[in-house]
Curated annotation (Swiss-Prot):
GO biological-process terms attached to the record: cellular respiration; deoxynucleotide transport; locomotion; mitochondrial genome maintenance; mitochondrial transcription; mitochondrion distribution; mitochondrion organization; pyrimidine nucleotide import into mitochondrion
GO molecular function, one term: pyrimidine nucleotide transmembrane transporter activity
Organism: Drosophila melanogaster (Fruit fly)
Protein name: Mitochondrial carrier protein Rim2
Alphabetic keyword roster: Membrane, Mitochondrion, Mitochondrion inner membrane, Repeat, Transmembrane, Transmembrane helix, Transport
Length: 365
C-alpha cells in the first residue's frame, strides 16, 4: 500500500473511531448542553420550587416553554396587565426573553435539573436524541478535519516560507481544516441540533422527517443556517491546536529523553490530558459562538444573523446568556476530548505499526 494512501486510511479510521466513541459516551451531556444553549432553557419559580423539594405546582405539568409559547404568553401579559399573576398556569414572574420583557432575572436550569426534566417528561431515550446524525457526521467530519490539517501542515512545512512546525503553521492548518470540515458537514449538525430541540415525548421525530421538514421550510439553504457562527468557531480550533501542538512537542522531548521505543499507558494518559486542557481553554475563549449557532438553528425567525443573534442575547440575557451551557460544555468536553484523543492515538499507533512499521515514533498530524 502506498505511503500516502496508508496515511489517509489511518486518519480516516482513527478519526472516525475516536469521534464515534466520544459521541456515544457523552451524548446525554451533548443534549443537555444544546437545551441550555437554546432560548427555551428558562424555568418558572414553581418548577424551581418543585426541584427544591416543594412539590409540583401545577399537577406535574411541564413548564418548560418553547419560543412561540413565551411569545404568546408575553402578548397575553401586555393585554392583561390588571389580570392575576398566574396566566395560563404559568407565573408572570418568569422571564420572557423573546419580547425583552422580564419581571426578574431569567432562571436557567442546572445540568442536573435539565437531565431530570428530560428523563421525567420525555423518557431516557431522549438523552440520545440526535445521536444518529451525530454518528453520521462524526466519521466524515473527523476524517476531513484531520486529513486537511495534516495535508496543509505538510504543505506549509515543505514550502519553507514559514518556520517549520511554528504556531503560524498550526494556526493556518487548523483554520483550513475547520473551514473545509464546517462547510462539508454543517447540514448534518443542523439536523442533529433540530432533533435535540424536539420536545415531543410521545412521537420522536425521525431523521427523515426532520430533513423533510427543514427542506419544506427553507430549501437547501436552510441546512446552512448557522454556518457563519461555525466559521467564527474556527478560532476555537486554532487556539486548541496551537496549545495542543505545544504540549505535544514538550511531551515528545520528554519521551525522547526516556529513550523508549514503545508507547505505554502513560503516553496515552498524557495525550488525554493535553487534549482536555487545550480544548478547555479554547472552549472558554470562543464559547459565545456556540450559543449563537444553536439559536440560529432553532425554529422561528427571531434570530437571523450571527451578530444580530449575539446582540439580542446580550441585550435580553446579558453576559450569562452568552455563556449559558458552558458548564455542561466543559463537563462534556473534557471526557469527550480525553476519550477521543486516547482512542485516536491508540488506533493510530496500532495501524501505524501495521502499515508503516513506525512504532518508535509519535504519529504526527
Amino acid at each position: 500500500m502506498a505511503q500516502n494512501t496508508a496515511d489517509t486510511l489511518i486518519h480516516l479510521i482513527a478519526g472516525g473511531s475516536a469521534g464515534t466513541v466520544g459521541a456515544v459516551v457523552t451524548c446525554p451531556l451533548e443534549v443537555v448542553k444544546t437545551r441550555l444553549q437554546s432560548s427555551t432553557a428558562f424555568m418558572t419559580p414553581s418548577r424551581l420550587a418543585e426541584n427544591a423539594g416543594g412539590g409540583p405546582a401545577n399537577g406535574g405539568q411541564s413548564e418548560l416553554l418553547r419560543p412561540e409559547q413565551r411569545r404568546k404568553l408575553s402578548t397575553t401579559i401586555l393585554r392583561n396587565r390588571s389580570q392575576p399573576q398566574v396566566i395560563g398556569g404559568v407565573r408572570r414572574i418568569m422571564a420572557i426573553s423573546h419580547c425583552g420583557i422580564s419581571s426578574t432575572t431569567p432562571k436557567s436550569m442546572s445540568i442536573v435539573q435539565c437531565l431530570r426534566h428530560i428523563v421525567q417528561n420525555e423518557g431516557p431515550r431522549a438523552l440520545f436524541k440526535g445521536l444518529g446524525p451525530n454518528l453520521v457526521g462524526v466519521a466524515p467530519s473527523r476524517a476531513i478535519y484531520f486529513c486537511t490539517y495534516s495535508q496543509t501542515k505538510n504543505t506549509l512545512n515543505s514550502l519553507g516560507f514559514v518556520e517549520r512546525d511554528s504556531p503560524l503553521v498550526h494556526i493556518m492548518s487548523a483554520a483550513s481544516a475547520g473551514f473545509v470540515s464546517s462547510t462539508a458537514t454543517n447540514p448534518i449538525w443542523f439536523v442533529k441540533t433540530r432533533m435535540q430541540l424536539d420536545y415531543n415525548s410521545k412521537v420522536q421525530m425521525t431523521v427523515r422527517q426532520c430533513i423533510e421538514r427543514v427542506y419544506a421550510q427553507g430549501g437547501v439553504a436552510a441546512f446552512y443556517k448557522g454556518i457563519t457562527a461555525s466559521y467564527f468557531g474556527i478560532c476555537e480550533t486554532m487556539v486548541h491546536f496551537v496549545i495542543y501542538e505545544f504540549i505535544k512537542s514538550k511531551l515528545l522531548e520528554q519521551r525522547n529523553q526516556r529513550h523508549t521505543d514503545t508507547k505505554g499507558s502513560r503516553d496515552f494518559l498524557e495525550f488525554m490530558m493535553a487534549g482536555a486542557v487545550s480544548k478547555t481553554i479554547a472552549s472558554c475563549i470562543a464559547y459565545p459562538h456556540e450559543v449563537a449557532r444553536t439559536r440560529l438553528r432553532e425554529e422561528g425567525n427571531k434570530y437571523n444573523s450571527f451578530w444580530q443573534t449575539l446582540h439580542t442575547v446580550w441585550k435580553e440575557e446579558g453576559r450569562a446568556g452568552l455563556y449559558r451551557g458552558l458548564a455542561t460544555q466543559l463537563v462534556r468536553q473534557i471526557p469527550n476530548t480525553a476519550i477521543m484523543m486516547a482512542t485516536y492515538e491508540a488506533v493510530v499507533y496500532v495501524l501505524t505499526r501495521r502499515f508503516n512499521n513506525k512504532s518508535n515514533e509519535f504519529y504526527d498530524f
